[in-house]
Amino acid sequence: MIKQYLQVTKPGIIFGNLISVVGGFLLASKGSIDYPLFLATLVGVSLVVASGCVFNNYIDRDIDKKMERTKNRVLVKGLIAPSVSLVYATALGIAGFALLYIGANPLAMWLAVMGFVVYVGVYSLYMKRHSVYGTLIGSLSGAAPPVIGYCAVTNEFDAGALILLAIFSLWQMPHSYAIAIFRFKDYQAANIPVLPVVKGISVAKNHITVYIVAFMIATLMLTLGGYAGYKYLIVAAAVSVWWLGMALRGYKTENDSVWARKLFVFSIVAITSLSVMMSIDFSATAAPEALMTYVW
């Protein structure tokens, strides 16, 4: 029973989000870590993400049964009653928001609320099922965790927070489109209007390339803005160029599914690498003037 309640929270997604939370938190901490704040932020975000995932499982149970990769989910198989899952999701969310408000700051909590509302209320309930732009809207919620981690420390939404929002939002797009390509038949069977299904895989490849270029530019802004150091810059440039190269090879591939799966796997490597590097190669003297120095 415990295993089922854990599975419905999507532990893999929680873990992936926590890596980005740590990146944002340590970037803002600049080597001076408030451990009680750190713990409250990690647990608070974990609870909110878990809540969102349970709500998503509840909302998607009708389409999950049509998809090969989701047909064995807990709610689809009836291992947890839908009404119970709603109570569970609500309890997780309330606990998470309360912990962020009390243990971090109101800004961190409100950022979590906004990410939650976008994911559950806008993306899961409507956009995912009705619009090709669902992925774009969903990317905003996916970018919330590192921003929450950052703002838990700074207690303000500054240029650094905005850059993190841009990096992680832009990353979500090729990452998600790659999944939609190698899971094309699943999305088609469930009638989910993702870009590769609606516009075609060739169009999706163009979008993937453009978003990776934009992602590359956004990642460099952390150093140009004085928030991260040159070691981070080198890694960011390297993974971005490699990821772009993989995307470009997609135009010549004979097997879109294999190519997309490789692109997806590397997307995880890329964002994890950036999260680690911003955690350890922060700039101790980040200032708005730094960006102007590079520009001029």
From Swiss-Prot:
Protein's recorded name: Protoheme IX farnesyltransferase
Reactions the enzyme catalyzes: heme b + (2E,6E)-farnesyl diphosphate + H2O = Fe(II)-heme o + diphosphate
Principal location: membrane
Keyword Transmembrane: yes
Membrane topology: Multi-pass membrane protein
InterPro entries given in the database record: Protohaem_IX_farnesylTrfase, UbiA_prenyltransferase, UbiA_prenylTrfase_CS, UbiA_sf
Key word NADP present: no
GO molecular function, a single term: protoheme IX farnesyltransferase activity
Keyword annotations of the record: Cell inner membrane, Cell membrane, Heme biosynthesis, Membrane, Transferase, Transmembrane, Transmembrane helix
Organismal lineage: Bacteria, Pseudomonadati, Pseudomonadota, Gammaproteobacteria, Enterobacterales
Further comment found in the protein's record: Carbon 2 of the heme B porphyrin ring is defined according to the Fischer nomenclature.
